[in-house]
UniProtKB/Swiss-Prot annotation:
A GO MF term: DNA binding
PANTHER family linked: TRANSCRIPTION FACTOR BHLH91 (PTHR46834), TRANSCRIPTION FACTOR TIP2 (PTHR46834:SF2)
Family per similarity comment: Belongs to the bHLH protein family.
Name this polypeptide is given: Transcription factor TIP2
Location of this chain's protein in the cell: Nucleus
SUPFAM superfamilies in the cross-refs: HLH, helix-loop-helix DNA-binding domain (SSF47459)
Main location: nucleus
Tissue: Highly expressed in anthers; strong expression in the middle layer and tapetum, and weak expression in the endothecium.
InterPro entries for this protein: bHLH91-like, bHLH_dom, HLH_DNA-bd_sf, MYC1-like_bHLH
Segments of this protein annotated with the region Basic motif: 173-186
Span of domain bHLH: 173-222
GO CC annotation terms, alphabetical: nucleus
This protein's record includes keyword Transmembrane helix: no
Length: 379
């Protein structure tokens, strides 16, 4: 079988080692290059040792072509010549010859002895013959000085690695385990964000952080609206109670005065005094106070209500002329304009409205803010 190192011995093909010419083995070894594997030297030494102990015919004499597989070389008869493992003296002789040839560049004695003994105890041989077996031309061990070692065969699967995207954290598939639960959790969270986004009026942005911020402001606004409506209902109820108490007191005082007038004239004076004393003192109603802030992409509204006074701050970006639309919205809400001021800061137009609520008008802060944003954004 062909070996790349055999090319180094092509100039030595003409040399023949006849029976009884063991001195030629040393000459051939001295002429070999340093890159040659020492297994070939061992083969030549084995041929010389076998030639000194066995007589053979001229037709069966081993040559260099015999060891390296010449093109016209026929395999020898099985019984003509057999090569066995060298004895211990030949081992040491071959190692010493290699060490002298390399001139001190040979590996340390311990490593060389271990490598040599590993080969001499039974190197790779073909079945039924004693010729050396060289690896294929593409084997890495063919270009190394030392015992033959076959490189591991590559994996047939293509060597693809599993990534964490195709395999679970614990070896499971992507549809099982932690990744499946995480995917379901994210889907539920996205559905909740979408539902919350639909409940918020006048959203500024669509990202999750802004949605949460708008939701917090809207919840606080709803709480203030509930308090404001509660105060309005309580105030209206107290007004009705006060009107009912005055009517009842006046009726009872008139009946008592008529009874006493029949008896004496002094009873009329006492009835008049009793009529003035029957009217209960007015109760102090709770003060109505609330505020709301609403914003859209280009509009900001701040509404503050204290009793019947409504103070409105309107901020509009990148566009002027929205004052007429805001005035029409205040008229629709039945708010009387008391004072108006305005200005411009950068690209923002700011207006301040001081208004009053009509008596009996059910106006609250959230309705004012929503109406102003709706009208100004459409302008």
């Amino acid at each position: 079988m062909y070996h790349p190192q055999c090319e180094l011995l092509m100039p030595l093909e003409s040399l023949e080692m006849d029976v009884g010419q063991s001195h030629l083995a040393a000459a051939v070894a001295a002429a070999m290059p340093g890159e040659l594997n020492f297994h070939l030297l061992h083969s030549l030494d084995a041929a010389a040792a076998a030639a000194s102990s066995t007589a053979a015919s001229a037709s069966s004499q081993p040559t260099v072509d015999y060891f390296f597989g010449g093109a016209d070389q026929q395999p020898p008869p099985p019984a003509a010549m057999q090569y066995d493992q060298l004895a211990a003296p030949h081992h040491h002789q071959t190692v010493a010859m290699l060490r002298d040839y390399y001139g001190g560049h040979y590996p340390p004695a311990a490593a060389a002895a271990a490598a040599t003994e590993a080969y001499f105890r039974g190197g790779p041989r073909t079945a039924g013959s004693s010729s050396l077996v060289f690896g294929p031309a593409d084997d890495e061990s063919a270009f190394m000085v030392g015992p033959f070692e076959s490189s591991p065969t590559p994996r047939s699967g293509g060597g693809r690695k599993r990534s964490r995207a195709t395999a679970g954290f614990h070896g499971g598939g992507p549809a099982n385990g932690v990744e499946k639960k995480e995917k379901q959790r994210r889907l539920r969270l996205t559905e909740k964000y979408n539902a919350l986004m639909l409940l918020i009026p006048n959203r500024t942005k669509e990202d999750r952080a802004t949605v949460i911020s708008d939701a917090i402001e809207y919840i606080q606004e709803l709480g203030r609206t509930v308090e404001e409506l509660t105060l309005l209902v309580e105030k209206k109820r107290r007004r009705r109670e006060m009107q009912g108490d005055v009517v009842d007191a006046a009726t009872s005082s008139v009946v008592a005065g008529m009874d006493q007038a029949a008896e004496s004239s002094e009873g009329e004076v006492m009835a008049a005094a009793a009529m003035g004393a029957v009217a209960p003192p007015p109760r102090q109603a709770p003060i109505r106070s609330t505020y709301i802030q609403r914003r859209s992409k280009e509009t900001f509204v701040d509404v503050r209500i204290v009793e019947d006074d409504v103070n409105i701050k309107l901020t509009k970006r990148r566009r002027d002329g929205c004052l007429a639309a805001a005035s029409r919205a205040l008229d629709d809400l039945r708010l009387d304009l008391v004072h108006l001021s305005g200005g411009k800061i950068g690209d923002c137009h700011i207006y301040m409205f001081n208004t009053k609520i009509h008596s009996g008008s059910p106006v609250f802060a959230s309705a004012v803010a929503s109406r102003l944003i709706e009208v100004v954004d459409e302008y």
